Curated annotation (Swiss-Prot):
<keyword id="KW-1278">Translocase</keyword>
<dbReference type="InterPro" id="IPR010226">
    <property type="entry name" value="NADH_quinone_OxRdtase_chainI"/>
</dbReference>
<protein>
    <recommendedName>
        <fullName>NAD(P)H-quinone oxidoreductase subunit I, chloroplastic</fullName>
        <ecNumber>7.1.1.-</ecNumber>
    </recommendedName>
</protein>
<keyword id="KW-0479">Metal-binding</keyword>
<dbReference type="InterPro" id="IPR017896">
    <property type="entry name" value="4Fe4S_Fe-S-bd"/>
</dbReference>
<keyword id="KW-0793">Thylakoid</keyword>
<keyword id="KW-0520">NAD</keyword>
<feature type="domain" description="4Fe-4S ferredoxin-type 1">
    <location>
        <begin position="55"/>
        <end position="84"/>
    </location>
</feature>
<feature type="binding site">
    <location>
        <position position="110"/>
    </location>
    <ligand>
        <name>[4Fe-4S] cluster 2</name>
    </ligand>
</feature>
<keyword id="KW-0521">NADP</keyword>
<keyword id="KW-0472">Membrane</keyword>
<comment type="subunit">
    <text>NDH is composed of at least 16 different subunits, 5 of which are encoded in the nucleus.</text>
</comment>
<keyword id="KW-0874">Quinone</keyword>
<dbReference type="GO" id="GO:0048038">
    <property type="term" value="F:quinone binding"/>
</dbReference>
<feature type="binding site">
    <location>
        <position position="70"/>
    </location>
    <ligand>
        <name>[4Fe-4S] cluster 1</name>
    </ligand>
</feature>
<dbReference type="GO" id="GO:0005506">
    <property type="term" value="F:iron ion binding"/>
</dbReference>
<dbReference type="InterPro" id="IPR004497">
    <property type="entry name" value="NDHI"/>
</dbReference>
Amino acid sequence: MFPMVTEFMNYGQQTIRAARYIGQGFMITLSHANRLPVTIQYPYEKLITSERFRGRIHFEFDKCIACEVCVRVCPIDLPVVDWKLETDIRKKRLLNYSIDFGICIFCGNCVEYCPTNCLSMTEEYELSTYDRHELNYNQIALGRLPMSIIDDYTIRTIFNLPEIKT
């Protein structure tokens, strides 16, 4: 008779413990109910990127001195710099500059070490294409400034998201 009573008491304690765990989980769920959503509706809402965001690289052809520092500091030797030595003035003349963003890891070393600051990171991150060869940007494509999403009236911009506290 006593083993049956102790089993019944253990069953009751386990039931109370299970109900307490379910209640704790439900309280955590309810604490998240009044927070703002973390996800955004992407094509119609876009985040304003931070100041130090590393997006597409912008290139200013007139400032470049063809020193190839960007190629030397790149971990994958990505920028292609074609130049010609002008013998009469003994300086390099830049002919072509290109970066393949299909291979680029957006580390920012080329921007950081450029002595003339002809490279800069933009806030543009929408580089998707159907053909990977379209990601090879020459100096003309690199020279284009990105469109500002703040000026686009069809897109709702979101300035800050709720931070996740860990």
